[in-house]
């Protein structure tokens, strides 16, 4: 395709043609820069969704989004070993903040975490909401986040702060009211670019697409989708896992019950408003046992497993991760991580922003 125009791209999508990575990168660049009109954004998002996004198309969206992001610069050795524990959201299950709690557990186990998230969209309480309620400032800039990762072992990139260009798509997304490619970009566009992670996806078709994008850029990532629709490693049903590592993707169906984790129900994992979900975080870190702890442990185990080769027995890798995750909570390390994180964040905020 020569000089790109919206009519050309939209006509191609309506014919069912696949776009190139360069095509979708151009479109996303137009959106992020504020050059695209609302009709163009809506038409593009819906036409791409109706055709079905390919890994190459999603890669273009991700590439442009990261180019427009406020980047968090981490030392390469730290970035190479850091993880993200994150989900797409959108499963409409209204659970507690499992990935947020798992992030604290992973950091308590000694693995650096750079979490990327936002306020609630389809749920009652998003990552940003619960972290803010617990006392973490959300407005830290890239230097502040990097300092938290270095000194506390965990940092948080508030999506609204680090992807300002996405504000141009926000009104259209809200008016459309249906999932589009935009709903799956968050876990793929962490501005610190950690090389590993456990990523939940509620959409069965998009989960392998996301895994292919992670694989293509050389990341070590487990993409997770519960057979009950959760964008987590669920304890209420088996979980389909796409293991992306060394440029390849391997799919498996795993069950937390095979790890000795008791079967839960979705009701066991349900949260509420921000005060309710923050209380669940505190109770977990204080050592409370039960279905919420079980779900957090298995998701933390998934993130910890990405630090090792994923071409072997995934169940055994998760079993090892479970033990490390439990020790993180039971030793008090996860609780100390949260306290230290809040302390560092408030200390660096006036200096680094």
From Swiss-Prot:
Q: Which domain of life is it from?
A: Bacteria
Sequence positions that bind Mg(2+) 1: 99, 232
Q: Give the protein's cofactors.
A: Mg(2+)
Keyword Transferase set for record: yes
Q: What does this protein do?
A: Catalyzes the transfer of the phosphoribosyl group of 5-phosphorylribose-1-pyrophosphate (PRPP) to anthranilate to yield N-(5'-phosphoribosyl)-anthranilate (PRA).
This protein's pathway reads:
Amino-acid biosynthesis; L-tryptophan biosynthesis; L-tryptophan from chorismate: step 2/5
Question: What are the protein's UniProt keywords?
Answer: Amino-acid biosynthesis, Aromatic amino acid biosynthesis, Glycosyltransferase, Magnesium, Metal-binding, Transferase, Tryptophan biosynthesis
GO molecular function (one): anthranilate phosphoribosyltransferase activity
Positions of anthranilate 2 binding: 173
Q: Which reaction does it catalyse?
A: N-(5-phospho-beta-D-ribosyl)anthranilate + diphosphate = 5-phospho-alpha-D-ribose 1-diphosphate + anthranilate
The record's section on SUPFAM superfamilies has:
Nucleoside phosphorylase/phosphoribosyltransferase catalytic domain (SSF52418), Nucleoside phosphorylase/phosphoribosyltransferase N-terminal domain (SSF47648)
Q: What is the lineage of its organism?
A: Bacteria, Bacillati, Actinomycetota, Actinomycetes, Micromonosporales
Among its keywords, does the record have Cell membrane? no
Q: Write the protein's name.
A: Anthranilate phosphoribosyltransferase
What is the UniProt remark on how the cofactor binds and its stoichiometry? Binds 2 magnesium ions per monomer.
InterPro entries attached here? Anthranilate_Pribosyl_Tfrase, Glycosyl_Trfase_fam3, Glycosyl_Trfase_fam3_N_dom, Glycosyl_Trfase_fam3_N_dom_sf, Nuc_phospho_transferase
Q: What is its EC number?
A: 2.4.2.18
| One GO CC term on file | cytosol
Gene symbol of the encoding locus: trpD
* Family matches, as HAMAP family: TrpD
Specify which residues bind anthranilate 1 according to the UniProt entry for this protein.
Answer: 87, 118
Q: Which organism is it from?
A: Salinispora arenicola (strain CNS-205)
Oligomeric and partner information: Homodimer.
Q: What Gene3D superfamilies does the record tag this protein with?
A: Nucleoside phosphorylase/phosphoribosyltransferase catalytic domain (3.40.1030.10), Transferase, Pyrimidine Nucleoside Phosphorylase, Chain C (1.20.970.10)
Covalent S-S links between cysteines: none
Binding of Mg(2+) 2: at which residues?
231-232
Pfam families assigned to the protein according to its UniProt record, in alphabetical order: Glycos_trans_3N (PF02885), Glycos_transf_3 (PF00591)
An individual GO BP term: L-tryptophan biosynthetic process
Protein family according to the UniProt entry: Belongs to the anthranilate phosphoribosyltransferase family.
């Amino acid at each position: 395709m020569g000089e790109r125009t919206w009519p050309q791209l939209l006509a191609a999508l309506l014919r069912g043609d696949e776009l190139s990575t360069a095509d979708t990168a151009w479109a996303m660049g137009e959106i992020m820069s504020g050059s695209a009109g609302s009709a163009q954004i809506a038409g593009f998002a819906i036409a791409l969704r109706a055709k079905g996004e390919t890994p190459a198309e999603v890669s273009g969206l991700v590439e442009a989004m990261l180019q427009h992001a406020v980047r968090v610069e981490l030392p390469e050795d730290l970035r190479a070993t850091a993880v993200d524990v994150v989900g797409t959201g959108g499963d409409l299950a209204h659970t507690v903040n499992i990935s947020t709690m798992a992030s604290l557990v992973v950091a308590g186990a000694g693995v650096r975490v750079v979490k990327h998230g936002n306020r609630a969209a389809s749920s009652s309480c998003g990552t940003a909401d619960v972290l803010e309620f617990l006392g973490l400032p959300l407005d830290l800039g890239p230097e502040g986040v990097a300092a938290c990762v270095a000194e506390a072992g965990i940092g948080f990139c508030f999506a609204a702060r680090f992807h300002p260009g996405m504000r141009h798509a926000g009104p259209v997304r809200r008016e459309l009211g249906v999932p589009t490619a935009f709903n799956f970009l968050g876990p793929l566009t962490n501005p610190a670019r950690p090389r590993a992670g456990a990523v939940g996806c509620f959409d069965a078709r998009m989960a392998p697409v996301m895994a292919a994008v992670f694989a293509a850029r050389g990341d070590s990532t487990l993409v997770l989708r519960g057979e009950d629709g959760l964008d987590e490693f669920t304890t209420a049903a088996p979980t389909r896992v796409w293991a992306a590592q060394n440029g390849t993707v391997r799919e498996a169906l795993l069950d937390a019950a095979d790890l000795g984790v008791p079967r839960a129900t979705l009701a066991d994992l349900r949260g509420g408003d921000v005060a309710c979900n923050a209380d669940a975080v505190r109770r977990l870190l204080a050592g409370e046992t039960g279905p919420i702890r079980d779900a957090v442990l298995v998701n933390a185990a998934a993130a910890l497993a990405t630090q090792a080769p994923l071409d072997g027995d995934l169940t055994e890798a998760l079993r090892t991760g479970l033990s490390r995750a439990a020790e993180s909570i039971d030793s008090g390390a996860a609780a100390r991580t949260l306290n230290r994180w809040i302390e560092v964040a408030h200390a660096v905020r006036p200096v680094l922003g």
